[in-house]
Amino acid sequence: MAQEVDGTHGTTVLSVVIPMYNEEEALPALVNRLRPVLDGLGAGYEVVAVDDGSRDRTAELLAAFRLGWPELRVIGLRRNSGHQAALTAGLDRAVGAYVVSLDADCQDPPEKIPEMLALAREQGLDVVYGVRADRSSDSAFKRWTAGGYYRLLRRLAGPSVPAHAGDFRLLSRAAVDALKALPDQQRVYRLLVPWLGFPSGQVRYERELRSAGRTKYPLGRMILLAADSITGFSAAPLRLATWLGGGAFVVCLGLLVYTFTGYALGHTVPGWTSLLTAVVFIGAVQLVCVGLLGEYVARIYTAVQNRPAYYVGHDTADGAGEQPSAPRPVPRSRTRAEP
């Protein structure tokens, strides 16, 4: 359970981790909204801006904002490592008793942070999710796909996964340390955080339109996120492949019985079309099964390599440069079989 931490001088009560990639257009609005909220807390805080290898003026603007905002800490990654890896970099280096993860586009309102912090303190919660009140602003396609995605998450990680909760959440120091101890290389925090089982609550909010710039989560990346969610938390696709193979075997067995019965009764069994259809069907099933197996093998391959999820080019907190993330511990049983 979360421990109460006061706001005495020199104590960082809250860290706000913000992954960003090419967010020069959204940064001014973010700073203008976030700083007054945090200054009004009356407690020590830091803002950990993780520049995920941006190619625009994001780094330049962050340096300029930092001149007048000493609580702003900038971590620059050497290359674009992806949103979840950038979030990992921020969580690894945040020092606050509580840590809030926030996107840079202001769609998740920073004004809800005090409410999340108050809820965690009052009820002794380790996790507070920001949950969308509704999705009326989304297109019909987005609502349909999002609904399916969250139903999938709840099947994989259980009912503890709140519907319509993204990466806007508050974590206690205990929850952050538990996440840092996990060996997972390819992380999906929407599943990892509920899986930990810490006491949690929710703060509902209306999601706003993007303040500026373009989304960094187009359809392709959303599909990849869904695939990582499935293969990272469940062996269900492999079981599905087994059932597909069994179903195809039953169909082929039925066709075989039908063919031999026809020959036994002296009937000519026309079958070039049906035979070709069966061959194509079986081939398609095999390719799907091989593809599913390949996804899992690729995850094992990545885990065995144990490469850092990100490389830090610089960190304004200590002037660090060229620092990889600490390799995640890989259990021996994952890399080789016991004799």
Regions found by a protein language model. Name each.
Residues 1-139:
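Structured catalytic core of nucleotide-sugar glycosyltransferases
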Residues 36, 40, 64, 68, ...:
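Conserved amphipathic alpha-helical interaction elements at protein-protein interfaces in regulatory
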Residues 21-25, 107, 111, 136, ...:
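Residues in soluble alpha-helical coiled-coils and helical-bundle/repeat scaffolds
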Residues 19, 77-79, 169, 242, ...:
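Short conserved micro-motifs on helix faces and helix-strand junctions that flank
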Residues 9-11, 42, 94, 163, ...:
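A generic fold-level signal
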